[in-house]
Design a protein with these regions (language model features):
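...captures the hydrophobic TM-helix bundle architecture rather than a specific catalytic motif
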Residues: 1-189
Length: 189
């Protein structure tokens, strides 16, 4: 087996593993959203609950981060190390901004008198908390992988011919973005 064939097989294997992981995550969130739908018929469900403004802003942050991560991938494919560095760092800032905005959103929910646990909590806010925190946990994995990608990039491990790590990171990041958009729209409507 040649070196190129080995790299091709390795890339396919990593992509397949990531695909299986994303399918598993999709199934978990499908279960959570199904439980959400079933629970909406409860008499104690908050009918007038609205998502906090910070969740809207965070949605734009995560969508923008998907674009910048894609631009980083395109830059490395052209061997443009400087642009890759810039786009990776912008992606990191936007990813962290998303997390910060989510916590600001939690604060906005509590400020309106809606709690996630305890005697003053509701099933609505508890479900919202579970779904968004589960997404944040998966995003934490995305941020860790992004930090590893940034580290490897600054160690000059990526080039136009070797960009599998960035490609896998972009694939997972896009998945997280699409997942959040789905969850956001689901929670909004």
């Amino acid at each position: 087996m040649t070196k190129d064939e080995h790299q091709s097989r390795t890339a396919r294997s990593y992509k397949l593993i990531l695909l299986f992981a994303m399918v598993s995550m999709t199934m978990m969130f499908a279960g959570l959203t199904s439980a959400f739908v079933v629970s909406k018929s409860r008499v104690d469900w908050l009918k007038d609950f609205q998502l906090p403004p910070a969740f809207f802003i965070s949605t734009f942050a995560i969508l923008a981060s998907s674009i910048t991560f894609h631009l980083a991938k395109k830059a490395i494919q052209k061997d443009n190390q400087k642009a890759t560095s810039q786009w990776l760092l912008v992606t990191l800032v936007l990813g962290v901004a998303f997390v910060v905005l989510q916590f600001i959103g939690f604060g906005q929910i509590v400020a309106k008198g809606y709690y996630f646990t305890g005697p003053a909590s509701s099933i609505t806010t508890t479900f919202l908390y579970i779904v968004t925190v589960m997404h944040l946990l998966h995003l934490a994995g995305g941020l860790i992988s992004l930090l590893i990608i940034i580290y490897n990039h600054f160690k000059q491990k990526y080039s136009a011919t070797e960009s599998l790590g960035i490609g896998l990171g972009v694939m997972y990041w896009h998945f997280l973005d699409l997942l959040w958009v789905y969850l956001f729209l689901f929670l909004y409507f």
